[in-house]
């Protein structure tokens, strides 16, 4: 994959600089210091990506080859847009030939070659609008959706797993045969019914934790490769 033109450090801050914010709480100051000095954050700034999450997708793809040959891609929970940046590049999506659709309830700045829907994915109209935006069956459905955290691990896990399940049902209903599904999960166990559903409909199902995911994070990704097609029994989308 060709790397985008180096954009430079747009923050005006020297890389590796300390954070001096007297009014911030200690925990917030610690997080901000870690974020600014994170090598993946620095690389994202230098290579023109909107977020460090770009390297999670690139690392997963380096091992599992899910982007190669993709003609249409749908990005769920897309803001601020680093995965969509990569998707537009690999599909050759342009303003005249849109092949990438991104959705998030958060506002997301324009990206060339990407149709952006500022909408909750659980909205009943969202699935059809996404498929219409890319003009047919996608080869990859990827989801970085996560529910807002409450601080209660079990609650956070269940809420994010629900989003993962809805995304999985969507992928099964819209993917082209041979397509792939990638979704964020949290450590704490993937529901058996979801794993069974994916194993029934895909040729390979694995959990992956890319190096770009912070070591202390409970974040993981569920990858289902090689969609078997819709002649297989499967569930339907439920909000």
UniProtKB/Swiss-Prot annotation:
The organism's place on the tree of life at top rank: Bacteria
Pfam family name, one: FtsJ
Location(s), subcellular: Cytoplasm
Secretion signal span: none
Annotated keywords: Cytoplasm, Methyltransferase, rRNA processing, S-adenosyl-L-methionine, Transferase
Catalytic activity: uridine(2552) in 23S rRNA + S-adenosyl-L-methionine = 2'-O-methyluridine(2552) in 23S rRNA + S-adenosyl-L-homocysteine + H(+)
InterPro entries: RNA_methyltr_RlmE, RNA_MeTrfase_FtsJ_dom, rRNA-MeTfrase_E, SAM-dependent_MTases_sf
S-adenosyl-L-methionine recorded as keyword: yes
Active site: 184 (proton acceptor)
E.C. number: 2.1.1.166
Recorded GO MF terms: rRNA (uridine-2'-O-)-methyltransferase activity
Keyword set includes Disulfide bond: no
Gene Ontology cellular component annotations, sorted alphabetically: cytoplasm
Residues binding S-adenosyl-L-methionine: 81, 83, 104, 120, 144
HAMAP family tied to this protein: RNA_methyltr_E
Family: Belongs to the class I-like SAM-binding methyltransferase superfamily. RNA methyltransferase RlmE family.
Function: Specifically methylates the uridine in position 2552 of 23S rRNA at the 2'-O position of the ribose in the fully assembled 50S ribosomal subunit.
Protein name, entry field: Ribosomal RNA large subunit methyltransferase E
